């Protein structure tokens, strides 16, 4: 019986698998094309908007020599009442090697994994999980800090509604980082992690900051009269960081001068674009591992 691998959340990967994937991803940073997925088909189906995740998955497939088909949800039969399960069953009948799915409802990728015979990759489900984002964030931190064990990171912003925060809290904590949550009470989840409502309280002790977007689309009612009100307390500025050696991350899209100010986005300590670059490489490693089924390896074969 062939084992079908899925990536629904970060806990699907062992410590050794994560290390192997990140090592492999670093080899892909040369942007060279390979033939690992030659003759393989990957379908992307995103029920929520995406720029970085969707594009990087599709680029990852092509750099591995595979074929990718994007299902345009706005023109698909889901608009005619077809259930997502019927959609998945029909896509599965076309024999893809993997389906990458994003959905507003938590749990959808896990359900699809039980109704298809190909690998399912979670490209983000509601406020639940975004495993490949956490993997690329870990790679970015390792490349920026040298090592992450024993280091401290402050996650700042709309944590309660953030799938990125959920996945990073699990993965970074597993690799020995102390995760500190910074948010107003209405953005703070129930947790045993250390919490503060002002970044200034911990700025002198953290090695990295992860700023998060305020996810207004997941709020039932407006929380702030204006995002400027939020920014006055939580925007990451050069004045706040001073000359501290702190790596600054953000999963995107960035609300300029709300999450991070213009000057800080141009600062070399800001790793936002490095995250995007690392994202393609990480997704290459994930897709190769799930589809080929062999363990992540440091040795990357060059295309012929």
From Swiss-Prot:
Catalytic activity from the UniProt record: carbamoyl phosphate + L-aspartate = N-carbamoyl-L-aspartate + phosphate + H(+)
Which residues are listed for L-aspartate binding in this entry?
80, 163, 213
Question: What family, per the record?
Answer: Belongs to the aspartate/ornithine carbamoyltransferase superfamily. ATCase family.
Residue sites binding carbamoyl phosphate per the record: 52-53, 102, 130, 133, 252-253
PANTHER family on file: ASPARTATE CARBAMOYLTRANSFERASE (PTHR45753:SF6), ORNITHINE CARBAMOYLTRANSFERASE, MITOCHONDRIAL (PTHR45753)
Record pathway: Pyrimidine metabolism; UMP biosynthesis via de novo pathway; (S)-dihydroorotate from bicarbonate: step 2/3
Enzyme class per UniProt: transferase
Q: Name one GO cellular component term.
A: cytosol
Question: Subunit arrangement?
Answer: Heterododecamer (2C3:3R2) of six catalytic PyrB chains organized as two trimers (C3), and six regulatory PyrI chains organized as three dimers (R2).
Q: What does this protein do?
A: Catalyzes the condensation of carbamoyl phosphate and aspartate to form carbamoyl aspartate and inorganic phosphate, the committed step in the de novo pyrimidine nucleotide biosynthesis pathway.
Q: What is its EC number?
A: 2.1.3.2
* Pfam family membership, one: OTCace
Keyword annotations from UniProtKB, A to Z: Pyrimidine biosynthesis, Transferase
Tell me which domain of life the UniProt entry assigns to the organism this sequence originates from: Bacteria
Molecular-function annotations in GO: amino acid binding; aspartate carbamoyltransferase activity
Q: Which InterPro entries match?
A: Asp/Orn_carbamoyltranf_P-bd, Asp/Orn_carbamoylTrfase, Asp/Orn_carbamoylTrfase_sf, Asp_carbamoyltransf, Asp_carbamoyltransf_Asp/Orn-bd
Biological-process GO terms, alphabetical: 'de novo' pyrimidine nucleobase biosynthetic process; 'de novo' UMP biosynthetic process; amino acid metabolic process
- Recorded protein name is Aspartate carbamoyltransferase catalytic subunit
